[in-house]
Every structure is written in structure tokens, then in C-alpha cells.
């Protein structure tokens, strides 16, 4: 009995061992299968990441992809430049009363004249400028202007805030007051802020170079133009205290001269737009270029706090607005040294039935500079 018992025990133990071995084998096979699946997934993810990276690289590469018979590339990595930037802004208010009397008030903040060095890498320029004309006005005005130009895409960002440092320029429609009677008179009844961002696409970017005219990173060799398409957003805030105007414009008692339409206190609105236009670079001599572009925009204007339904939005033309961005550039560039000037103007319009506001933001740049650190492929 003991022997039989021992034999049976051994047989059971052997059977149990086989089951354990089979279970271990199954577990090992499952681990191998999971490992294979994981490795396959990782390879798939790596392929996806590599493909996405290649697509992104080609997309970025196309920023400066052009026909070299029309456009000479930048042979250098870096740029040093000295620039003079002149900026000025104009606000024009116009009101018309029920009797048809039209009055306008034009005013400007103190213009800024800035000089400073810039350092560039490819399309990106960084620098610092000093206001040499009105250093005391710095505390009353904040200004930031950024533009990016590449062969295919470009963008503009503007932030300007002015608090009380305005001067009257022109007044019309006021009885007994000449157009220039209060020219350059202080006006502390206006605070204003402008924020704007826009981006655009250059259709004929292989032959037409925006950078050649406005950031000197390439040289246009043959005259050429291109259609432009963009979109953007802007916000305007204007706080207006008409009682700060000269008493001759306001009148007294029953002899009130200013129309009610100009007695507003605040305007604040958002503007969402699309824009289209055309740019042209004229090569009028070797290494010499004159560029011009014009981009009007149309979009929806929404007053702050205003809620509009779809039918109200599109049936009332007063909810639509029209703005414009214009550029001019004159450049001499021999691919190592360069000098030139550019003018950029942004016009923002606001209209109601008997009131309109025009805000014009303008920048004029004069510059001279050179390139250095030649790229490896051009050494």
C-alpha cells in the first residue's frame, strides 16, 4: 500500500508539474505576444511621428521656398541693423445732426521718433529703440509693433495705448471757428487703445518676395506681383470727454455749438475680418526695389456687451465694417549691405447712422545694415 501510495503521489506530482509548466509556457507566450503588439504599436507611433515631423519640416521649409531666377536667397545667418522708426496715429471723429450740420474733430497723440539697433536671425528681428523726440511722453503712451515676413506667410501684431497726450489738428463745421484755429492745442479728454492681429498668405510666393521689400532677408531680381489673402481680429477702445474741448467749440448756454452726435463717452468694439489684396515689387535698377501692397478687409463688428442673433447680424449692414492695410517699401540691397525705407499704414473705421470714427496707425522706418556669418552651403 505504501508503495502504491508513493507511486500515485509521484504521478499526481508529475501531472501537477506538467500543468504548472503548461501554465508558465502559456504565460510566456502571452508576454511574447504582448511584447510583439507593443513593439508594433511603438513602430507605428514612430512612423506617425516621423511622418508628422517631415510634414512640419516641409511646411516650414516652404516658408522660404522660391524660384531663384526671381529671388536671391539670403546668404548669411545673421543681420545687424540701425533703424529709425517714426510712428504717428490720427483719430478723426465726425458727427452729423438731424439738420444735416456736419462737424469733424481730428486729433493726434504726440508722434514718436525712435532710434535703435536691431539684430536678426533669418526672418526674426529683435531690437530696442529709444524715443529721442518726446521722452516725457513715454509714461502716457505704450506701443508694441511686431511684423513677421516670410515668402509664403506673414503676420502683424499691434498694441497701442494712449492716455491723454493728444493734440487737436483740425476742426470743421463749428460756427465762427476756423479749421486751424486750434491746431496743436492740448486735448486731455481722449484715452484710446488699439489691439490688432492679422495673418495672410502670399499666393505667388515662389516669384514674389514680401521679405525683399520689408525685412531685407532676400533680394527681388525680377519685377513680380501676387494676390494676398488674410484674416484677423482687432479691438478698439475709445474714451472721449467732449467737455475737455476748447470752450469756443462747445459754446455756452443757448449758444451750444457742438452737435449731440459728438457727445459720446465711450466706444468699445471687436472686429473679426477677412482681407484680400495685391502686392507688387518693381525692380527698377540693379539691387534696387520699390514695393507696394494694398489689403482692404471686410468683417463683423461687435460692440462690447452686445448680443446679436444670426438674422440681426447679417441683415443690418451697420454690423459690417471695412478696414485697410497699406505698405510701401524702397530698398537697395546688394546681398551684403542694405539700406532703405518703408511705410506701413493700418486704417480702422467705425460708422453709425450719423457718426463715424477713423483711427489711422502709421509707421515709417528708415534703416541701414549688413549681413554676416555666411551660411555653409554658400561658402
What is the predicted role of each segment?
Residues 104-116, 168-172, 181-194, 238-271, ...:
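Extracellular/periplasm-exposed beta-strand and loop segments of Gram-negative cell-envelope proteins
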Residues 84-90, 121-125, 130-134, 150-152, ...:
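Transmembrane beta-strands of outer-membrane beta-barrel pores
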Residues 85-89, 93-98, 104, 158-196:
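Outer-membrane beta-barrel translocator/channel fold
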Residues 196-199, 360-379:
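Outer-membrane beta-barrel "beta-signal"
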Residues 88-114, 125-137:
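Surface-exposed strand-loop-strand hairpins of Gram-negative outer-membrane beta-barrel proteins
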